[in-house]
């Protein structure tokens, strides 16, 4: 689907036909396309006054897609696809029980130039600079480098648009005692990103977290669960690149 660009806000997730100057309005981010004689100029300034400029040769118009993508590109791809989500409040799970929660998950925004054959990423943006951080799970000399974000549970409405997506987590405690859970580490690149066109709703594939005990102690295995779209009009914008869909947290999860 595409829509002609007029004097509206051009920031809903969608594909736009651009044939003149436009502004794209995202939180803490300024984006402009300028029509030139031989194509288009692209300009972006973020909340920290970092700027980028690019040129797009074209005769008359371009197709611009705005879509959420996995939070793995900024500040650089150095984590082997792992993400470390630290809960602002620990969750207590009683013995031998299951609970389901919904949490915020950070996203980035991709700006794509679409053609009949492909959709090429022109730029990728984070509307919250605090998401562009690294964290270490485990010990300094042998731990896992991860993208890091502090997150909270979602109780009713969708979280801040363009900054967060929604994810459901089913926690299964197989132990005979209660456990406190304060963090989740898993390969985000195994997940897909889903969004609704002309909207700001975003969902990421869900998780199942299994707490169990073996000879090494208490562990938590996190496994991807495919988001059930229930026939709704969800689009897939980022299908991930990693076939590994699970991770065992054997260095603590409280």
Residue ranges and their predicted role:
Residues 1-254:
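Interface-prone segments of viral and bacterial extracellular assemblies
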């Amino acid at each position: 689907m595409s829509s002609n660009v007029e004097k509206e806000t051009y920031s809903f997730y969608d594909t736009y036909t651009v044939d003149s100057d436009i502004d794209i309005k995202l939180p803490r981010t300024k984006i402009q396309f300028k029509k030139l004689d031989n194509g288009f100029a692209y300009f972006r300034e973020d909340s920290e006054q970092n700027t980028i400029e690019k040129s797009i040769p074209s005769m008359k118009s371009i197709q611009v897609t705005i879509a959420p993508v996995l939070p793995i590109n900024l500040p650089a791809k150095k984590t082997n696809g792992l993400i470390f989500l630290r809960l602002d409040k620990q969750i207590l799970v009683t013995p031998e029980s299951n609970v389901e929660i919904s949490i915020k998950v950070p996203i980035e925004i991709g700006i794509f130039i679409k053609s009949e054959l492909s959709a090429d990423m022109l730029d990728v943006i984070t509307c919250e600079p605090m998401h562009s951080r690294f964290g270490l799970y485990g010990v300094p000399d042998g731990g896992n480098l991860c993208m890091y974000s502090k997150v909270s549970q979602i109780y009713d409405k969708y979280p801040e648009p363009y900054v967060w997506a929604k994810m459901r987590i089913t926690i299964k405690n197989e132990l005979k005692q209660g456990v406190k859970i304060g963090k989740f580490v898993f390969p985000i690149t195994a997940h897909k990103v889903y969004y609704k066109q002309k909207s700001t709703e975003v969902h990421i594939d869900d998780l199942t977290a299994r707490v169990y005990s073996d000879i090494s102690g208490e562990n938590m295995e996190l496994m991807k669960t495919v988001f059930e779209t229930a026939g709704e009009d969800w689009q897939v914008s980022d299908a991930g690149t990693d076939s590994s869909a699970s991770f065992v947290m054997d260095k603590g999860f409280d």
